[in-house]
Amino acid sequence: MTSHALLTVEEAARRIREGRALILAGDEAALARLPAGTWIGGTTPYFMTAEGGLRSRDHVFASEVPAAAERVAIAVYAAADLPRVYAELPERGYGVLLMPLFSLAELAFAVGAPGYDGFATRPLVGWVSGTDVGDTGRRAPKVYDGRTGAALLQEAVVLQVSLPAAITAEIGIVNVFSAGGGDVLGFAEGGFSASEVLVDGRLRGLTGYLLETGLDVRRPLVGEYCGARLNVGVREVDWAAGVVHFWAPVFPGISYRHAAPVGEYVDEFLARAPAQVLAAGTEGLGFCCNCYSNYAHGELEGKRTGPFVGPVVFGEIAYQLCNETLVYLSVGGPRG
């Protein structure tokens, strides 16, 4: 039986009752019907499956914790408690963190994670839950503590997985975007929105700069954080107020460039993924998620993304909050 699958609610409930430890994604109506057990979940109706990308309110995507896991625990964190999240991960193993879009937990983690005690010393992956884009503003994103079935609006939930010494967990990011050759951009203040931008060191109004240059806001800004190339996608441009809202925060002191154009998304994903991960296939993955912006702009509905199956989400976690990336966790023996 595959460890990652799109299931009916009844199939997911059966696996929970069998005592399996699961990471679940689905519409609120589907997740609310599940029994208590060792699982965490988050809302999204979009998925990458072996048959291609799809939208479904009636199914649940399940990723099962590897059978080799020695211990699985669940913890809930309020925003003020998140600085402990790395210190409380198992010494050998990994964590999966889920939090609702625009929740207090997401805002705290997005800005504060790099300063947490033990940041990036242990593998932490996860995602930001959302809703069908047609329900934006009408339904709230949620995450679930499967021990009780409680739906959480402002907190984060973490699955803590302990592994034997012979098993390793390694985070990977597939980013189809690279920095273009345009202006170097910076921000004097950090956050999820900005009205001003530093253009090659000169302060300018951000919306005016976008109008003047005609930048395609479907492509993100690309910056380097802690040696990794990460994206900041534009969520909305409020032309009247002169403010740009982002899916992930910008940080002062980071240099950004507008992303270069991308060709066929699936081809780019597979070309940039490590060969050993592709060879290992889905069974070698302990976790995977892709960004909704990639799903929408890359027109991934009905398209297959190789071994990378999982939920389509509204922010990805690979140590810290990422955007417009595919994040995965490889679980297996030591590599030679």
Feature annotation, model-predicted:
Residues 1-336:
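Hydrophobic alpha/beta core scaffold segments
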